[in-house]
Amino acid sequence: MSDFSMETLKNLRQQTGVGLTKCKEALEHAKGNLEDAVVYLRKLGLASAGKKEHRETKEGVIAALVDERGAALVEVNVETDFVANNSVFRAFVTSLLSDLLDHKLSDVEALARVMSSQEPSLSVEELKAVTMQTVGENIRISRAFYTPVNSGQSVGIYSHGNGKAVAIVFLSGSENQEALAKDIAMHIVASQPQFLSKESVPQEILEREREVFSSQVAGKPQEVVEKITQGKFKAFFQEACLLEQAFIKDPEVTIQGLIDRAAKASGEPLRVEHFVFWKMGA
């Protein structure tokens, strides 16, 4: 039987911001004494982290990893760029990628509850508290992404600005086109497409753009309106859709043309299945 009440456990959690499991452990170690339990958690580097959680986090890093378990992406924010480049903080971020891959998670709240691969005796939330204590700043896990990597896929990652923007590209049709996938990922970071193709643009976006274009040419003959609108849509697709964009390394060819050229050279039916692009704070 426990030496503490549920009310004491609740008070310890509210006072320290530490997870349920570690609070129970602290109270058991302290034989139900609240003050001793707080001291115990402080010695573990957990108890003072809660005081930092209100601080604003504008800096940080976006990190990505692809291996046999799949592809993972995580954005973790801190208060200053100095800590964003701290080795302790970076090690914590790297461990999150492994946790996402191990548990196949894309949910930040679910990630916080799993046991950390970096420190198996602590949950991710508890390790975050320890890391906050070590670096002296608030840490926020903002978003997470996981997807399996299938056979016959090539995956490319490109990171810009030491993790300020990251793209992952998934090519189907070959497992040997990582260089092409990385080139396209680099292009995505530079050109920031909103959609994969013309066909993937939502209907409401098309209708919005058509209204804007029509208002710009109001009063002109219908055939002129149609011609101008078609031209404006072409320009819109070339700016917003990855496959229609001019390749950043060779503007004479579109991304679709680049893929077609690689497919012809390799004899493999290549296509971009999807991509993920994250920019810090966006």
Curated annotation (Swiss-Prot):
<dbReference type="InterPro" id="IPR014039">
    <property type="entry name" value="Transl_elong_EFTs/EF1B_dimer"/>
</dbReference>
<dbReference type="InterPro" id="IPR009060">
    <property type="entry name" value="UBA-like_sf"/>
</dbReference>
<dbReference type="InterPro" id="IPR036402">
    <property type="entry name" value="EF-Ts_dimer_sf"/>
</dbReference>
<keyword id="KW-0963">Cytoplasm</keyword>
<comment type="similarity">
    <text>Belongs to the EF-Ts family.</text>
</comment>
<dbReference type="GO" id="GO:0003746">
    <property type="term" value="F:translation elongation factor activity"/>
</dbReference>
<dbReference type="GO" id="GO:0005737">
    <property type="term" value="C:cytoplasm"/>
</dbReference>
<dbReference type="InterPro" id="IPR001816">
    <property type="entry name" value="Transl_elong_EFTs/EF1B"/>
</dbReference>
<dbReference type="Pfam" id="PF00889">
    <property type="entry name" value="EF_TS"/>
</dbReference>
<keyword id="KW-0648">Protein biosynthesis</keyword>
<protein>
    <recommendedName>
        <fullName>Elongation factor Ts</fullName>
    </recommendedName>
</protein>
<dbReference type="InterPro" id="IPR018101">
    <property type="entry name" value="Transl_elong_Ts_CS"/>
</dbReference>
<comment type="function">
    <text>Associates with the EF-Tu.GDP complex and induces the exchange of GDP to GTP. It remains bound to the aminoacyl-tRNA.EF-Tu.GTP complex up to the GTP hydrolysis stage on the ribosome.</text>
</comment>
<feature type="region of interest" description="Involved in Mg(2+) ion dislocation from EF-Tu">
    <location>
        <begin position="80"/>
        <end position="83"/>
    </location>
</feature>
<keyword id="KW-0251">Elongation factor</keyword>
